[in-house]
Amino acid sequence: RPGHAVPLLVAANRDEFYARPSLPLGHWDDLPGVYGGRDLQAGGTWLGMHVDGRFATVTNVRSGHAVRRGPRSRGLIVTDFLLGDSSASAHAHALMANARDYDGFNLLSWDGDNLSWLSNQADAPRTLASGVHTLSNAQLDTAWPKTDRLRRAFTRVMEAHSHNPVPALLEVLRDNTRAADEH
């Protein structure tokens, strides 16, 4: 939403192992300026922001293969970006060099001007155009039943409630309809 008072609007649910210990959204005493949920097992986050306007989120990628437990937690990718000063695009391109050190992931990173997507299951990062994008446990904008349903719903909300879409987006996220597991 370039030129808008709120240029980036993210609506997300945490789709994780619920038994994994975590803290809800809050500021991090040990990393001033960072806000997000916190993975108490590995110390990172699945979604975070920094007071300087940086934002990042990571999802696991389902491959159908056994998880190999890479040497670093994917949640640390988010923290590394939030604490850095590289643009979203530069960070994504630099991360490609060691992206295979992690189990499958998608990363969305926002530097205040541009939104980048990177997956270690794809050939190269992308800077995203304005619009509605969906991300689950495959590549960006993959046509899965749940992401297709959300894309349609989010598009309707943004068209009907562009002045204040948050309440309607939260209502969409409350839908607990379970899609068939086709992937």
Q: Would you name each region that the model predicts?
A:
Residues 1-183:
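N-terminal nucleophile
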